Curated annotation (Swiss-Prot):
Protein name: C4-dicarboxylate transporter DcuA
InterPro entries per the UniProt record, alphabetical: Anaer_Dcu_memb_transpt
A Pfam family it matches: DcuA_DcuB
Alphabetic keyword roster: Cell inner membrane, Cell membrane, Membrane, Transmembrane, Transmembrane helix, Transport
Domain of life: Bacteria
Cellular compartments annotated: Cell inner membrane
GO molecular function, one term: C4-dicarboxylate transmembrane transporter activity
Reported function: Responsible for the transport of C4-dicarboxylates.
GO cellular component: plasma membrane
PANTHER family: ANAEROBIC C4-DICARBOXYLATE TRANSPORTER DCUB, C4-DICARBOXYLATE TRANSPORTER DCUA
Cystine bridges: none
Membrane topology note: Multi-pass membrane protein
């Protein structure tokens, strides 16, 4: 009991240290935690999530190639046009555009490019930017749990498919429930005071001359290679969804399966990157310098350290976890969503949280191919791994706060009371609630 107490202290200390260091420090601190747990507290090292890391690397490589060819900018340009064309609907369009950008790209960092546009359009309509900004940032995080190419979804489909929930079925649950949750949250936020000219912070900045009027940006010309790179990438995503569905046990269009789903995603994405490099004539040596590549490789290190730390602790206490979790979650299914929510707050990654906890939960609930009565709990609760918005240190949150020159999107005085907390909790709560309605019907 005493040993377990010290192990939990080391686990929590490593997570808090990682959050404090930020960036790559999240992964570094995870490695430090593994070192202390194994060498000083006698635990056996857990499994390193190489499959998740490889998928992230492959997807990020393809997106980075598309970014280098101008395809990512073209995608953002399309999003900008939509936002500027219907400015009065910014509260619904900002989260919608952010959501579908993330669904397609598999990373929430695409929202960075939208932030200045959201601020401009909101300001021109006398709407506080904090509402559409917070909705867009949170939507980009929860969309990771519905993106066909995100590491989290790929991992979950891989572990749940042998239990009878194939790739396409899971997407049929996660995409509509998470998107509808984003729209319902936008509707609820519409009842708050959204008038920009009623915000004292904004009026003070306006009086001091710190705020310039919204500027309409001139439309850039898009090269053929930018458009081509986007279509190649979209083709790759569609091919992955089709292939993963075709090799699933329920559909079984391709049999025998020579290339498994994880390997297929890696090879498809690397092939997409190759085609972009060839046909869009980009310099492959420069891809590593792109912002997407850097943030993606940072994510790999974070997943490496944090997921390894989580698996080291969990795998050494699997019997105790099984004993308590089996009856608690079976009797109170929502507790899994709460546990995933709290874990993702600290682990800072949907994929890392899923990798660290879901295998243990499956074992604890006794789920197998022959016993799937509790499978819906895991599928419905998955969206709750999106609580990256709780601590205001995530890059997209900080970017939204920094780029909102109106001053309406603020850091909380008491850390947690920031602009993203309420919409974030609402989106996750509604996603999970809708999941508990839809999952039993679809599975």
């Amino acid at each position: 009991m005493v040993d377990a107490f010290f192990q939990i202290i080391v686990l929590l200390f490593s997570l808090f240290l990682g959050a404090r260091l930020g960036g790559l420090g999240v992964g570094y601190a995870g490695g430090l935690g593994v070192l202390i747990l194994c060498l000083f507290l006698g635990l056996n090292p857990g499994k390193i999530p190489f499959d998740v890391i490889l998928i992230i690397m492959a997807v990020i490589s393809a997106i980075s190639a598309m970014q280098k060819a101008g395809g990512l900018d073209y995608l953002v340009q399309i999003a900008e046009k939509i936002l500027r064309k219907h400015p009065k609907q910014i509260n619904y369009l900002a989260p919608s555009v952010a959501y579908f950008l993330t669904i397609l790209a598999g990373t929430g960092h695409t929202v960075f490019s939208l932030i200045p546009v959201i601020v401009e359009v909101s300001q021109s309509q006398n709407i506080k930017p904090k509402a559409p900004l917070s909705l867009a940032v949170v939507s980009s995080q929860v969309a990771i749990t519905a993106s066909p190419v995100s590491a989290a979804v790929v991992f979950m489909s891989g572990i749940l498919e042998p239990l009878g929930a194939d790739y396409l079925t899971l997407l049929m649950v996660w995409i509509p429930t998470t998107f509808l949750a984003c729209m319902l949250t936008a509707f609820v936020m519409g009842f708050t005071d959204l008038k920009l000219d009623s915000d004292p912070n904004y009026l003070e900045r306006l009086k001091a001359g710190k705020i310039s009027p919204p500027m309409m940006k001139k439309e850039k010309e898009t090269s053929k290679s930018a458009k081509l790179s986007l279509w190649i990438f979209i083709g790759g995503v569609v091919a992955i969804v089709f292939y993963a569905s075709a090799i699933s046990k329920n559909i079984a269009l391709i049999s025998p399966v020579i290339l498994g789903r994880d390997y297929a995603i890696v090879s498809f994405m690397l092939s997409v990157a190759t085609l972009i490099a060839i046909f869009c004539k980009i310099n492959a040596n420069e891809i590593a310098h792109s912002s997407v590549f850097k943030s993606g490789m940072q994510a790999c290190v974070c997943v490496l350290g944090v997921a390894w730390l989580g698996d080291t602790f969990v795998s050494n206490h699997i019997d105790e976890i099984k004993r308590y979790a089996s009856f608690l979650i079976a009797d109170y299914p929502f507790l899994l969503a709460v546990a995933l929510f709290l874990a993702s707050m600290l682990l800072y990654s949907q994929a890392a949280t899923s990798k660290a906890l879901i295998p243990s939960v499956i074992t604890a609930l006794g789920i197998s191919a022959n016993h799937t009565e509790h499978l819906y709990i895991i599928v419905a609760s998955f969206a709750s791994v999106s609580a990256l918005f709780v601590l205001p240190t995530y890059p997209t949150l900080l970017g939204a706060i920094a780029m909102d020159h109106t001053g309406t999107t603020k850091m909380g005085r008491y850390v947690f009371d920031h602009a993203f907390l309420i919409p974030g909790v609402l989106v996750v709560f509604l996603s999970v609630a809708l999941g508990f309605v839809v999952a039993p019907l679809v599975l």
